[in-house]
């Protein structure tokens, strides 16, 4: 697990540095474009399979302001939530199994985003946004040397409120956001059923 965490944070750091050097050396993009890359913290709401909050996620978004305040763009993010289930006996096929389990839900939504942003060009730029698209989810249980899983597709919707802060004349700014998301994904794994994936979380990253 420690090695996995180290790899994750190295990937995040390298991605952030790469984007920072690829962007123009201004506090914001020189035209009407915008972009942000974020670390993501996620707390699942009532999915009864893997409902432990985690910081195993990232968010990517970019777009273009079609008016002075309205921006349209694309997004993609991913997240993994995990939960350990203690030793129990349950039915599997024609027999019974007694074991502990490691549950995981991996979510990968992507699609279109729209935002309304205030004070463009200023140091503090609050906004509200909505994301709509599709969500791929992998719901799995690992136990003993076995794995039970189901892949699911669903519709995804997510309102968001956030702020971009540009404290420097040059370089990228800071991005902070709170969001709620809901996916219509459904799955049946072993004796568990998942009917919809809802989450509340926050994002912290770089804004361009």
Segments (PLM) and residue ranges:
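Membrane-embedded beta-strands of outer-membrane beta-barrel proteins
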Residues: 37, 58-60, 112-114, 128, ...
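Short glycine/proline- and aromatic-enriched beta-strand/turn motifs that initiate or cap beta-hairpins
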Residues: 25-66, 71-72, 207
């Amino acid at each position: 697990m420690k090695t996995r965490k180290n790899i994750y944070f190295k990937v995040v750091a390298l991605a952030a540095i790469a984007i920072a050097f690829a962007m123009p050396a201004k506090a914001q993009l020189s035209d009407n474009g915008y972009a942000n890359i974020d670390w993501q913290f996620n707390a699942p709401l009532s999915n009864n399979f893997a409902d432990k909050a985690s910081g195993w996620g990232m968010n990517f978004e970019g777009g273009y302001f079609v008016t002075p305040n309205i921006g349209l763009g694309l997004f993609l993010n991913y997240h993994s939530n995990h939960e350990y289930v203690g030793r129990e006996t349950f039915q599997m096929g024609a027999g019974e199994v007694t074991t502990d389990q490691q549950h995981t839900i991996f979510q990968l939504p992507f699609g279109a985003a729209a935002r309304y942003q205030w004070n463009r060009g200023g140091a503090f730029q609050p906004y509200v946004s909505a994301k709509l698209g599709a969500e791929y989810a992998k719901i799995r249980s690992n136990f003993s040397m076995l794995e039970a899983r189901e892949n699911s597709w669903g519709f995804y919707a997510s309102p968001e409120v956030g702020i971009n802060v540009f404290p420097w004349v040059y370089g990228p700014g800071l991005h902070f956001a709170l969001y709620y998301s809901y996916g219509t994904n459904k799955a049946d794994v072993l004796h568990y059923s998942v009917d919809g994936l809802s989450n509340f979380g926050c994002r912290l990253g770089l804004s361009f």
